[in-house]
């Protein structure tokens, strides 16, 4: 478990791990040069529970910390937990049971997203208690990014699948970099319908922070993931091809949108990202599989480089609350002015 600047969340996370119903755990806390009290708190936890080992290292980022934990791990199975999240008490036991019962290489559980206001949202609600997939089915699910996302947490892995330097150091979206490679190593993949992982949504996290590095890292990761899947599935069925095209079309649309609306990007950064996305989108068909009418319209406006119309379309369809607020403010200001001007015309 990588630990960095999570003093407020560390205790509930560690408590959820040491409270697992499956007791034979090796718990590795990797202090990634955290500037707060986390290093001392980790040592205090190690004194309370002999299963806990603490590694202290210079700050190298999430990937570097995860790699350090992997190098230190001695168990047959590996479970990743982020230090601002928490897990259900039965998570390790239930997932290990499924691993053994189905002779699986990887087991996935469902998760709930927890927002700062305390609201919780279950991210996926399947109809079957357990689903067992082969490798090609798993690749298709990764492309759809619904039930099977690219997160490395909420999964139990056989240790032999994971090289010691699995994650790319210095890159964000490291999960997406490695998931296709891990999937290729699996024969059997099990997806449980139960929620065992609680993901704490961070409004200031990497996923929400739109910098030039983050946007380029995201494109790098997605391109590598898709290249890996194409390499592992050279005779890709049409359904998988459509899923990949739809994902690329959605990503192109989202990044075009970021170029339009993110205020922190410089003009040079906007140009660089726009050129990169344009080059990527040129490889897509004019009709992206699975797009609805609103998405098709938005996509075509970008393809035709009509950015002004695209911005209006974005505000009208994808940012309706903000658009409605602006309209109400405009009406509130304009109506009294209109009435006053009409009165002046009447008496003049």
Each language-model region and where it sits:
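Short, well-formed alpha-helical segments that are part of the catalytic scaffolds
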Residues: 5-19
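Short alpha-helix within the catalytic core of nucleotide-sugar-dependent glycosyltransferases
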Residues: 11-15, 39-43, 67, 75, ...
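A conserved acidic beta->alpha catalytic loop
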Residues: 16, 31-40, 58
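A short, glycine-/small-residue-rich helix N-cap motif at loop->alpha-helix starts
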Residues: 58-64, 70-73, 171-172
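Donor-binding/catalytic cores of nucleotide-activated saccharide
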Residues: 62, 83-190, 200-213
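Short aromatic/hydrophobic "clamp" motif used to bind/position activated sugar donors
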Residues: 78
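Catalytic core of nucleotide-sugar-dependent glycosyltransferases
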Residues: 196-202, 209-236, 253-285
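Membrane-interface aromatic/basic loop that binds lipid-linked glycans or pyrophosphate carriers
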Residues: 261-348
């Amino acid at each position: 478990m990588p630990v960095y600047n999570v003093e407020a969340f560390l205790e509930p996370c560690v408590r959820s791990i040491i409270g697992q119903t499956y007791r034979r755990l090796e718990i590795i806390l990797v202090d990634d040069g955290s500037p707060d009290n986390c290093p001392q708190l980790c040592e205090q936890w190690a004194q309370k529970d002999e299963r806990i080992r603490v590694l202290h290292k210079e700050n190298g980022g999430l990937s570097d910390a995860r790699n350090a934990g992997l190098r230190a791990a001695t168990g047959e199975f590996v479970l990743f937990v982020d230090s601002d999240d928490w897990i259900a008490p039965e998570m390790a036991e239930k997932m290990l049971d499924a691993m053994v019962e189905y002779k699986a290489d990887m087991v996935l559980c469902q998760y709930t997203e927890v927002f700062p206001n305390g609201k919780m949202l279950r991210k996926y609600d399947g109809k079957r208690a357990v689903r067992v997939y082969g490798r090609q089915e798993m690749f298709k699910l990764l492309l759809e990014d619904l039930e099977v996302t690219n997160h490395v947490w909420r999964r139990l892995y056989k240790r032999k699948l994971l090289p010691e330097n699995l994650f790319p150091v210095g890159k964000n979206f490291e999960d997406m970099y490695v998931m296709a490679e891990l999937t290729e190593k699996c024969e059997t993949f099990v997806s449980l319908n139960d929620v065992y992982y609680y993901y704490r949504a961070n409004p200031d996290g990497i996923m929400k922070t739109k910098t030039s590095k983050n946007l380029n890292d995201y494109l790098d990761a997605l391109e590598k993931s898709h290249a890996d899947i194409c390499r592992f599935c050279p005779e890709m069925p049409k359904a998988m091809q459509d899923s990949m095209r739809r994902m690329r079309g959605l990503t192109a649309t989202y990044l075009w949108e970021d170029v339009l609306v993110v205020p922190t990007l410089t003009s040079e950064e906007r140009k660089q990202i726009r050129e990169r996305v344009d080059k990527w989108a040129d490889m897509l068909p004019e009709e992206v599989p699975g797009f609805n009418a609103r998405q098709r319209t938005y996509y075509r406006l970008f393809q035709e480089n009509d950015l002004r119309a695209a911005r209006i379309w974005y505000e009208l369809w994808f940012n309706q609350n903000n658009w409605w607020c602006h309209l109400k403010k405009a009406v509130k200001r304009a109506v009294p002015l209109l009435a006053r001007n009409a009165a002046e015309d009447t008496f003049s």
